[in-house]
Curated annotation (Swiss-Prot):
Interacts with FAM83D. Interacts with SIAH1. The keyword Phosphoprotein applies. It comes from the Eukaryota. Residues 412-428 have a biased composition (Low complexity). InterPro entries: Hlx-hairpin-Hlx_DNA-bd_motif, Kinesin-like_fam, Kinesin_motor_CS, Kinesin_motor_dom, Kinesin_motor_dom_sf, P-loop_NTPase, RuvA_2-like. The gene is KIF22. This is Kinesin-like protein KIF22.
């Protein structure tokens, strides 16, 4: 009893230690299937930078059209009423005396810490052409911009956090691309051609085939970035001698891997985006290729505005796919990134409309809500110890066993009764790491019950060996049953086909004969009557000696067209034809001619196909040229064509003939 109590105590202690040791692994396993920690929603932060007057600019002595009020607000003249000003409120405002360090430290540097938490961040430079976007992002050797400052600080952070002795190992990679005329081009590998933008099952935007360069120091970054920057497309316009003709995107990825259990891994992305500026082709003087480039830039920026409006209005469809720029910015606007928009504006009055447009876009963008999250997953090799322990539970290979057939069939209970190594006891509990302590206690009770039964010599039917054998036997039986069913189905199908063929032979012998021996037994065709205008009816009571015969039965024989064309049989077929007496036709013509020569315009309208206009034409022609000599002279009237004349005769002569026939009857 004492030994049994000590064994139970050891098992209880091992269960508690196992639950505490692998609780983190259970959480990581949940994160692998999408259970990520989500921080609260984050609004897109907007900063506005006012560049100084450019040297040599005409009208530099004039007062600027924009004026800063404090560190977060500015005002601009109202073009509708010059006595008023429009005020804008943003997260930050940097005047014309602000430096590159002020902008970086105030707006960009605070979001870098999110990368080490496995979250995404984005920095976008927006504004019209010549407003200083590229200077803000790249800068100069004397005044470095956002990109070199961010990379320098980020690499320093990764070196500190990934140093020896720290729980995480960090690595940094970079990619650099441009969107030129709706084509995604790799600036690190210009020969790669147009790349496609994809979306994985978790909604992450990726570009297959995009180059990724590992960097561990700022020197590594410069070695890759400087040659790639020279590959970006630039051109000269009237407003800017080095105008960016494409949108440039620098993607920096930070991978983190935990050195200790539960061996988690994180991935954070930093998007540094230099957007091309919107252009007014009337002022830039773009022609040819420059005009085509300007059209592509303005179109993508217009779609960007539509995306912002759709997000603010809560529309069910956000047009990310209408442009490759918005498709790539899906994480930055309304996605999972901490985003900062730097709107660059110019103080000159000639850029007033562009400045107002940029400020309105910035004001709409600050209403966009992003939902960042920490993307954690479990490293693949973290599941290795669990798999090894499961293999150990299956026992040694068959070749190393020296047991009889009875032991191999039933299994030995000794390994379950005696305490084994710690790994063998911990591995079953690792599967249950997500359960609460009460459930673990119940499983321990069941384990004790099974152990007590095993110690009494009862066969353990739940051993892995037994389970495999029973499962294999069940699978073999199911396979045999399936084969028998398939064979039986084929026999039934063959029998049904034979029955159908026999029924066709018995009930449809003519269908199985050759075509040349088939006999045509068609029914006698019905008589057909040709119904002419005014429903001409055959008068059965008419006298055979009558002067006018409207219908006459005319019989003629036709050959039946058989399928094989071999039967010489001929069938007589009766049909009805319309035959009008010449006297009736002459009488109808004369009556129409009298009406044309003597009738008024109202009388003429009683004729078919004659309306008020044609009646007036007939009366006028008759007054000028005299009476008609024949009905066909009606075609000489101006406005009556030959086709109209034929239609007139058919409609009126037959109608009058039928009317006279009915009157005679």
């Amino acid at each position: 009893m004492a030994a049994g109590g000590s064994t139970q105590q050891r098992r209880r202690e091992m269960a508690a230690a196992s639950a505490a040791a692998i609780s983190g692994a259970g959480r990581c396993r949940l994160s692998k299937i999408g259970a990520t920690r989500r921080p609260p929603p984050a609004r897109v932060r907007v900063a506005v930078r006012l560049r100084p007057f450019v040297d040599g600019t005409a009208g530099a002595s004039d007062p600027p059209c924009v004026r800063g009020m404090d560190s977060c607000s500015l005002e601009i003249a109202n073009w509708r009423n010059h006595q008023e000003t429009l005020k804008y409120q943003f997260d930050a405002f940097y005047g014309e005396r602000s430096t590159q360090q002020d902008i970086y430290a105030g707006s960009v540097q605070p979001i870098l810490r999110h990368l080490l938490e496995g979250q995404n961040a984005s920095v976008l430079a927006y504004g019209p052409t010549g407003a200083g976007k590229t200077h803000t992002m790249l800068g100069s050797p004397e005044q470095p911009g956002v990109i070199p400052r961010a990379l320098m600080d980020l690499l320093q952070l990764t070196r500190e956090e990934g140093a020896e002795g720290r729980p995480w190992a960090l690595s940094v990679t970079m990619s650099y691309l441009e969107i030129y005329q709706e084509k995604v081009l790799d600036l690190l590998d210009p020969a790669s051609g147009d790349l496609v933008i994809r979306e994985d099952c978790r909604g992450n935007i990726l570009i297959p085939g995009l180059s990724q360069k590992p960097i561990s120091s700022f020197a590594d970054f410069e070695r890759h970035f400087l040659p790639a920057s020279r590959n970006r497309t630039v051109g000269a316009t009237r407003l800017n001698q080095r105008s960016s003709r494409s949108h440039a995107v620098l993607l920096v990825k930070v991978d983190q891997r935990e050195r200790l259990a539960p061996f988690r891994q994180r991935e954070g992305k930093l998007y540094l985006i230099d957007l091309a500026g919107s252009e007014d082709n009337r002022r830039t003087g773009n022609k040819g290729l420059r005009l085509k480039e300007s059209g592509a830039i303005n179109t993508s920026l217009f779609v960007l505005g539509k995306v912002v409006d759709a997000l603010n209005q809560g529309l069910p469809r956000v047009p990310y796919r209408d442009s490759k720029l918005t498709r790539l910015l899906q994480d930055s606007l309304g996605g999972s990134a901490h985003s900062i928009l730097i709107a660059n504006i110019a103080p000159e009055r000639r850029f007033y409309l562009d400045t107002v447009s940029a400020l309105n876009f910035a004001a709409r963008s600050k209403e966009v809500i992003n939902r960042p999250f920490t993307n954690e997953s479990l490293q693949p090799h973290a599941l290795g110890p669990v798999k090894l322990s499961q293999k150990e539970l299956l026992g040694p290979p068959e070749a190393k066993r020296a047991r009889g057939p009875e032991e191999e069939e039933i299994g030995s209970p000794e390994p379950m009764a005696a305490p084994a190594s710690a790994s063998q006891k911990l591995s079953p509990l690792q599967k249950l790491s997500s359960m609460d302590p009460a459930m673990l206690e119940r499983l321990l009770s069941l384990d004790r019950l099974l152990a007590s039964q095993g110690s009494q010599g009862a066969p353990l039917l739940s051993t892995p060996k037994r389970e495999r054998m029973v499962l294999m036997k069940t699978v073999e039986e199911k396979d045999l049953e399936i084969e028998r069913l398939k064979t039986k189905q084929k026999e039934l199908e063959a029998k049904m086909l034979a029955q159908k063929a026999e029924e066709k032979e018995n009930h449809c012998p003519t269908m199985l004969r050759p075509l040349s021996h088939r006999t045509v037994t068609g029914a006698k065709p019905l008589k057909k009557a040709v119904v002419m205008p005014l429903q001409l009816i055959q008068e059965q009571a008419a006298s055979p000696n009558a002067e006018i015969h409207i219908l006459k039965n005319k019989g003629r024989k036709r050959k039946l067209e058989s399928l094989d064309a071999l039967e010489p049989e001929e069938k007589a077929e009766d049909c009805w034809e319309l035959q009008i007496s010449p006297e009736l036709l002459a009488h109808g013509r004369q009556k129409i001619l009298d009406l044309l020569n003597e009738g008024s315009a109202r009388d003429l309208r009683s004729l078919q196909r004659i309306g008020p206009k044609k009646a007036q034409l007939i009366v006028g022609w008759r007054e000028l040229h005299g009476p008609f000599s024949q009905v066909e002279d009606l075609e000489r009237v101006e406005g009556i064509t030959g086709k109209q004349m034929e239609s007139f005769l058919k409609a009126n002569i037959l109608g009058l003939a039928a009317g006279q026939r009915c009157g005679a009857s």
